[in-house]
Amino acid sequence: MISIEGLKVEFGTTPLFEDVSFVINKKDRIALVGKNGAGKSTMLKILAGLQQPTEGVVAVQRGITIGYLPQVMILSDTRTVMAEAEMAFEHIFEMQEKLEKMNQELADRTDYDSESYHELIERFTHENERFLMMGGTNYRAEIERTLTGLGFNRTDFDRPTSEFSGGWRMRIELAKLLLRRPDVLLLDEPTNHLDIESIQWLENFLKMSSGAVVLVSHDRAFINNVTNRTIEISCGRIYDYKVAYDEFVVLRKERREQQLRAYENQQKEIKDTEDFIERFRYKATKAVQVQSRIKQLEKIVPIEIDEEDTSTLRLKFPPSMRSGNYPVICENVKKAYGDHVVFHDVNLTIHRGEKVAFVGKNGEGKSTLVKCIMDEIPYEGKLTIGHNVQIGYFAQNQAQLLDENVTVFDTIDRVAKGDIRLKIRDILGAFMFGGEASEKKVKVLSGGERSRLAMIKLLLEPVNFLILDEPTNHLDMRSKDVLKEALKEFDGTVIVVSHDREFLDGLVTKVYEFGGGLVKEHIGGIYDFLQKKKMENLNELQLSQSPQTASPKKEEPAESESKLSYEAQKELNKKIR
């Protein structure tokens, strides 16, 4: 479908990657991985035809359509949600308009026996059959399925897109892209603005899709569930594995060990050669051999080793005083903005040492309850913070509180105490501030970089109760592993607001579900909760489809039927008639 040959991209004089070649085939589900700045988003832009490589060729098979979802895009505010989603079916509307004109012409004409009239009937029949095959009569149902799958309520369909946040408008763009059903989908961080239910829906959609998918994501569970091939960009090269991400991690570790052995052998060879040259440089009897060794040394191509895997780095929180038995107790807590009730009658008790997750669709009040606990906003009811509780709070706006005039290294050096100061550079590297990045001033950092720095700073402060609101948003998978292990070893209490299943798995032992103005407690881990939710949804479906009330459901044609060839569909229609 797409062939990439000899690709090279340079920024200034430094190549981002070079001599990159691979092929994207139908049904490929490719995870494009690598550290931040390796060139993943650049690769997607090149595949989408939005950026030209310095060298090389991207050949797209004739007739192949490509759909691209960037991390950031310009969004329209002039239409309703439904009208915006309908833009994916412009070709249907064009066909509909054409059919209406042809139909009107047939109605106006009276030369029923003429050859041109019969030709018009044939053209109309042909176009009408194409229109039906392309979903001309059921496109609206497809839009509704996609929008609800991505978390919209039916009451949202007629609301203007300007009423929605940037994250929700990105969902509309994703819906339009999926509805167009391109042959190749290029997705850059598609789960960034999705909740768990929407992520699971997207997973199922992509797995059922007949085209190819190339995606960049830091959601490990998502890429494991969707992909069957992993392409890593590392040290300016690519490594192509025909396996899902978890298996790739194992193979990558083996590859790095082999590289390390080869590197050590090469270094020994270089040292031995240099020693020989130095020892016999001024001996006339060895002149030929010395010159030979010098040429040999010049021909050696240095072996590069992949970036060090920082996931084995262990962080330990500094000691803090022991808190009371119940760090947080909520009694009949309610929060409303005017007539809009976010939640009501919230009753929960979090015990010392518990690690709990707040989950639910966006806008259901997870971050709002966190702000109530932090006493940042007023609320109704009673909310008690326990004895000796020292809260460490992370939210995206915490990054704004950093001192802009100091470096990344100094920001962390100011809070680090004891032996941990010897590991500052390792810690910074684990959170993608390796090398020269640690000497950058805070004021030149991007929003995502500032968030990561605020997270590191929090990890080194002595607290006994952590509240983390979307802590993994700007972390790569290795950074998330480091953070997760640190939290697992933390002996205090933790509340995590997150949609990242892989991050929550094995970390939390209780889940609070936000939805419909209520907060429900579920004992167990995130996958226990999701399994229970799946069963509840099935039970609700069975109840709503009980024999007494269920109406017979018209079976929808399978996707493969809707994509039959024109002649085959024509024959099928004859048989039906």
Question: Where on the chain are the PLM-derived regions?
Answer:
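ABC ATP-binding cassette signature C-motif
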Residues: 1-263, 311-312, 316-577
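Intracellular alpha-helical coupling/juxtamembrane segments of multi-pass membrane proteins
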Residues: 251-276, 280-300, 304-306
